[in-house]
UniProtKB/Swiss-Prot annotation:
Keywords: Isomerase, tRNA processing. Belongs to the pseudouridine synthase TruB family. Type 1 subfamily. Its EC number is 5.4.99.25. The keyword tRNA processing applies. Gene3D superfamilies: Pseudouridine synthase (3.30.2350.10). This is tRNA pseudouridine synthase B. It is an enzyme of class 5 (isomerase). One of its GO terms (biological process) is tRNA pseudouridine synthesis. The gene is truB.
Amino acid sequence: MADSKLAQQHGVLVLNKPKGPTSAHCIARIKRLGQKKIGHAGTLDPMAQGVLLVLLGQCTKISGYLMEGGEKIYSGTLELGRTTDTWDDEGETLSTADWTHVTEEDVVRAVDLWTGSSEQQVPAYSAAKHKGQPLYKLAREGKETPVKTRRIEISQAETLAVELPFVRFRVHCSSGTYIRSLAHSLGNRLGCGAVLTELIREYSHPFSLDEAHDLDDVLAEPAELAGRVIPLDKALPHWPKLRLSAADEARVKNGMPHPYDPAEMASMPFTEGIRAVLLDPAGDPLALAETAYRNQVPVWTVLRGLWNT
C-alpha cells in the first residue's frame, strides 16, 4: 500500500529487478511509496533480471553523468536452433533449424568473436526511436522498421557452460549494448539461429548485484527505504567532493564559476574536464561541476545544479 508519509528520498536505489515486469512497472510500484520524483537509468527488458538503477529525487538530474562511459556486465543463456521476431524467448517463433552440426569449440570461438568494437544491429522490438516513434510500436503495428545500428564495445566475452543447444555466457560491454543482438548474430554465424532465453545484469556502473535489493523486500518494508538508498553524494564515487563556504555557495547558485584551488586537488593536477561534486557548507550536494578556463583562469563551471528541491 502507498505510504504518502514517506519522505522523498534523494539518491540511488540499486534494485534487483525480477523477471517478468517491465522496468516502468517496477518504477511505478516504488513511486507509490511517496516517491513522486523518480526515474531509472538503463532499461531492462521484461524477461531480464538484475541491476536496475532507480533514481530518486535530485538524483534524477544526474542520470546522464551516472551512465556516462559506464560498463555493464551481463550473464545469460541462449538457445541454438530457432529464431523469433524479438530475438529472445518472449517472441513469436519465426524459424527452427538443425543445430547438431555445431560443436562446443564452434560456440566458444563464436562467443570470443563478440570481443572488440563493432556496429551492432538494433532489434526491431526495442525502445530505440525512428522519427520519434519507438521501434517496438512500429513492429507491433506491422509497419516496416528501419535497420538501425549503433557502435558498441565488448571488453570481455566468455563462455561459461555449453550444454547444446543451450549456451551460458558472460559479457562486459558498453552502455547501450543489446544482448539479444549478440545472441542473434551468434546464431547467424553458426548457421542455425539462436535466441536469448535468460539474462541477468550483474553490474551497471558503478553498482553491482551484490548491492541490489529485491523489489518484493522494498515494497514490503517501506520504512526501510531510506536505509536502502545510496545518497546522492555517494552515487558518483569516483568524482572528487569539494565543500564550499556559504559565500561560494551563493555565488554558484547565481551562476558564477567557482575558483579552482590547487591545494584542494593536490593529487590531481589541473586539466580541463575534471569533474567533481560541489557540496554546500552542510555537506549536501550543491552541483556537478567541471574544470575549465575562463579568461585564462582555471575555474569550476557548473554542469548541473542540484539545489532545487
